[in-house]
């Protein structure tokens, strides 16, 4: 991996004892066909709502929600994205330190990938999932308490607010994952409301395209040709045709719960499961065993430009790297805690990960480095 990088972190807990980790598992399917979107809209910036509430205190039924914030929480576990040219890394700073009066803002922060220094704060008060458009100019941003998705330019200027997913009362982001197609024409959003929505994204146009009904979708990955979407959900792993909305496959050979999916550049789909802890390689109609994860609870997977696979766990800080050319696996230098979302740099040289307490982490040829905290 290349030679330079930088440092950051966050976590939220509930006095009600709700586990966020329990909300982030799965890979699956529901119906055998999609439905044309009859609701949902791309609202232009001039009509969009103001910033989401900083710390909502009531559910829709009027009951109260108590949230405990911790000053050592910095980065959203799923809020990480690398720019298509590899020059920048974005992550979402959690609201914890803002609520506690320790920071003046929270939301999307952008770092220089080579130095690990903060170059921009979007001050958008969003701390959920994050995706970077392959054209490099747009970011799609979720929020911990808001079901609407914001699409902004890289300076933080709001372009559209995507509405259609339902609000979820329980703690944990209602938007579980966001992914742009490789050609940049679609944005997929997975929600805990039991749907995956597809949004058309072309130049200066945004429109709702389709909604797929899927039981508890958690992870998304587009195929290299942008024609298919793999969905990790509570009851299994499925592959959907994005043009017809038809479910093409429900992978019965992959036991559920499936906790992660990622397409490689050659079209091979990698799926990981937590019970038992295993990985699978899906090549067309063939499903074969993949590299053995480092622990029994693999939770995230990322595939590089040259097909190398990184797998992390929810219960152990180890990150395993597997090279398909040599069929050899190794452990990356151990991070200080378990990591969230992982992404490779476009050239496949660096691996980035979100750490709630320690910020953005970067594995390079000479070891593990931390970006500056936001």
Model-derived features with residue positions:
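N-terminal secretory signal peptides that target proteins for export/translocation
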Residues: 1-7
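WD40-repeat beta-propeller superdomains and closely related acidic/aromatic-rich repeat-like regions
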Residues: 3, 17, 21-374
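N-terminal export leaders
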Residues: 10-16
